[in-house]
């Protein structure tokens, strides 16, 4: 079976790295994620990753608690840097060559984000992990995923979550909630479905960049998507 995609952008939330823990990085969880990523890399699909920081610090929560929102967002960006380094290290142990590029400069630790370099590294078979979101406060890492996916020419944004797609309501709170197989960007925005923020949806819509929402906890889901199988929910123009 041939690959459905040549280049994809995977969005991982920081919360997904916690596993069953209340905080931080669960090593077993990150190793399982890397095993799924390794399968895709072996198929020959070029993979970029945008990673969140909510397992360490959430800028929105810091702002709500009385901290200056911009300061809180910068702290959240630093949290994504820690997650990116942890993910890169786990990939190295699994034999995957990966590079971290950051929207905030920290030259002794990671490369700065340079678009042509990122594209070249993808073409050479490396996984590129984008850290520090967009580098600007008030923008989520979901928006960073939409932005970087557009910049590097990804064919789809793969949004890994704890649920297996986009639902009409929160399935944990509403047992009658139904999962969409496909849904348009305009419909997702108008219904205020809280899977990605409206800015990310709007950017992907304008760039005609589809989003597939799937469960990170479902073994083999990432590989099945890359092979073109129906998994999760496709958000499209």
UniProtKB/Swiss-Prot annotation:
It comes from Burkholderia cenocepacia (strain HI2424). It catalyses: UMP + ATP = UDP + ADP. GO terms for biological process: 'de novo' CTP biosynthetic process; UDP biosynthetic process. It holds the Pfam family AA_kinase. Its main location: cytoplasm. GO terms for cellular component: cytosol. ATP binds at residues 11-14, 54, 58, 161, 167, 170. It is found in: Cytoplasm. Belongs to the UMP kinase family. The keyword Plastid does not apply. UMP binds at residues 53, 73, 134-141. Its EC number is 2.7.4.22. This is Uridylate kinase.
